[in-house]
Amino acid sequence: MHSPLRLEDSYSGKTIALTSDEISMYVCGITPYDATHLGHAATYLTFDLINRYLLSAGAKITFSENITDIDDPLFERAIKVGTDWRSLATDQITLFTSDMTELRVLPPHSYRGVVESMDVIIDYVETMKARGLTYTLQGDLYLDLSQCPSFFEDLPLPHEEAIRIFGERGGDPFREGKRQALDPLLWRKSEANEPTWRTSFGDGRPGWHIECVAIALSTLPDVGRSSITIQGGGSDLRFPHHYMTGIQAQALTGKSFSQLYIHCGMIGLDGEKMSKSKGNLVFVSRLLEDGRNPNAIRLALLARHYRDDLMWSND
């Protein structure tokens, strides 16, 4: 590849040059219940720019993106609006792909949901269980991090801070009976009114991180020293999601998951963090309905360093 791209790894802080002619890239996709807000758009525009540069430099790039179509927020929203979670997911995926087309984002080679990846997920969980890497707690299956020493050796933040952030971002560090506060959930037992799959280790559905492990490893070619070249997403995924994904993939393959972790900044609105809880999300589709030029939206979101946060204003 001519003109290698140099990017900073989010964990090591080192600048790494991508010199290989073959690149694989996995970017975490949406949970299809509230798409597409500007935070989504900024993330996928960032990786669209990386994708386009690598293509123009002569690299053969394989790009995969997931759809988190099994997740608590999706089920909660479906109940709130009185619809089936599958219908809600389908509608939101359609809206998201339309928004990405308007913003001129090149589609990934693989765009795969959790539901259609369930056989692979179950196989990977069974493999970890057979290797003695898991334990059961009241019907739920956890990864035993004491069997993964590199987790604590390479932890990218102080242990107590990791526990706090883990709890804020979907983890359960204080659940009684866990061996380690940071042990991640691999499989949760089935609950009423939720989708469930029958397995040898109990009926239920997967945890968040193993979903991305399965989709990434099953849709991207192995690149040698690591399983993939680039793992990407918003900076809110740096920990725990991407770190946990890397540890679980390493437990399966015996080598590092990604050569390079890339995280882009967050989008705020009028001086505040943009979030669902604040109710201040700005949606691409509504901007387009109001007559905003999609190329102007693209330019505005790319007019910053990709790692920097951006404060959006509707003025």
Please annotate each region the language model reported.
Residues 67-71, 93-96, 106-121, 139-147:
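Short, glycine/charge-rich beta-strand/loop segments that flank catalytic centers
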